[in-house]
Amino acid sequence: MEKSKTPRLLEKYRNEITPQLMETFKVKNRFAVPRLDKIVVNMGVGEALTDIKILDKAMEELGVITGQKPIIRRAKKAIANFKIRKGQPIACKVTLRRAMMYEFMDRLINVAMPRIRDFRGVPMDSFDQAGNYTLGLNEQIIFPEIEYDRITRAQGMDITFVIKYAKSKDQAKELLKLFGMPFKESKE
């Protein structure tokens, strides 16, 4: 039986990032260092209200991008202004953990982001109070797994990096920087 290969970013985290964060934040225990817990990729598909095939196509594309089958997200409550009824399918999402999470992050940072037109980095102000980082992408075309000829419409997505054990936004920001996340330079 063949032993599965450890993802490159996981090796980097264990061998380089953890010791560096321990030194930077004066942490004695390596288990108290900020760690990437999961990545949630969400595609909101408002047009699915009129045509369910659009949601099916979005689910197929999200599955190809992440390598995992997406789940359908339904409306929690009715919103009359948007013509949404409770329980209607309006989005699809994937939660990535362990090896698949690191593989996806590697492809996102090193393959997909450089393909974004006029890319100057991701904004630094998208951290919440818990240290989680949310990134919005306008198109799914930047991923090499998506065939340009087969897409019917450009579909955006939100990618949330859930970070455990970060005591502040700065610790979470430092972790993502060490992973290679291309943040915009702050104007001071």
Regions found by a protein language model. Give the residues of each.
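Ribosome-associated RNA-binding proteins
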Residues: 1-188
